[in-house]
């Protein structure tokens, strides 16, 4: 027990002491990557585990994109926090398990926004990881991978689930990300693109049926 506590303390110390330029963002490591913020700003990890286990490394440009998008949405919705999940490891190797991509520091998973069943906004998605809070197609919505499930295509959640997509805040996040010229593309399920009324600007893509569902998070790919 003491050993586990000591190990956790060391991880926390390392995460807190990433080298920084004077009055600026962290300095890139040997792979040219920097950690995403782990503090209390408008961009935060969904769980401290993403920082402790070094799953939050990105290029300096990708960091700027995420920080600025979060700030833009927080300006529109004061007090809002954008939560990130997996980005890349510090070594820059692809692919970054369990993903089919990630790893080079140019890709970040951002959580969508939710309300409770009562309609009140949730501060962060339910669950332990930020993933798998799926918002399934409604009747009449496009269904891209009908009949496919398993590791890549998990089944829909029950109708009785205690969360629902917060469409206004999620749309604001997608628009803040896609309007940045440094963003190459984002992955989002077609039924959410249609439901949110997102314009076809060439950046919002369907990831295919081999990859994980993207109606629980936004995958951002930076140039």
Question: Predicted segment positions?
Answer:
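Extended, low-complexity, intrinsically disordered C-terminal regulatory tails
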Residues: 65-97, 185-207
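Positively charged n-region of N-terminal signal peptides that target proteins for export
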Residues: 1-4
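Short, surface-exposed glycine/acidic/tryptophan-bearing loops
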Residues: 98-113
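Hydrophobic helical h-region of N-terminal Sec-dependent signal peptides
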Residues: 6-14
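Active-site acidic/histidine clusters and adjacent loop/turn architecture
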Residues: 22-84, 166-183
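Catalytic cores and adjacent binding grooves of peptidoglycan-active enzymes
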Residues: 23-24, 117-223
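Envelope-exposed proteins and targeting segments
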Residues: 78-80, 104-108, 182, 214-218
């Amino acid at each position: 027990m003491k050993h586990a506590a000591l190990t956790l303390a060391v991880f926390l110390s390392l995460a807190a002491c990433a080298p920084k330029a004077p009055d600026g963002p962290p300095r890139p490591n040997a792979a040219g990557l920097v950690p995403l913020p782990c503090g209390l700003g408008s961009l935060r990890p969904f769980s401290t585990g993403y920082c402790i286990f070094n799953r939050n490394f990105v290029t300096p440009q990708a960091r700027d994109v995420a920080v600025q998008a979060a700030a833009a949405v927080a300006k529109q919705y004061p007090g809002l926090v954008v939560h990130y999940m997996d980005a890349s490891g510090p070594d820059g190797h692809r692919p970054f398990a369990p993903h089919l991509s990630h790893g080079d520091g140019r890709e970040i998973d951002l959580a969508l926004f939710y309300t409770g069943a009562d309609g009140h906004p949730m501060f962060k998605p339910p669950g332990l990881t930020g993933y798998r809070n799926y918002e399934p197609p409604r009747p009449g919505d496009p269904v891209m991978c009908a009949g496919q499930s398993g590791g890549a295509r998990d089944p829909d959640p029950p109708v009785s689930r205690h969360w629902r997509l917060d469409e206004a805040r999620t749309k604001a996040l997608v628009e803040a990300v896609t309007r940045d010229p440094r963003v190459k593309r984002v992955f989002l399920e077609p039924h959410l693109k249609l439901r949110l009324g997102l314009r076809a600007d060439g950046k919002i893509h369907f990831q295919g049926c081999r990859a994980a569902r993207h109606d629980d998070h936004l995958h951002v790919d930076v140039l």
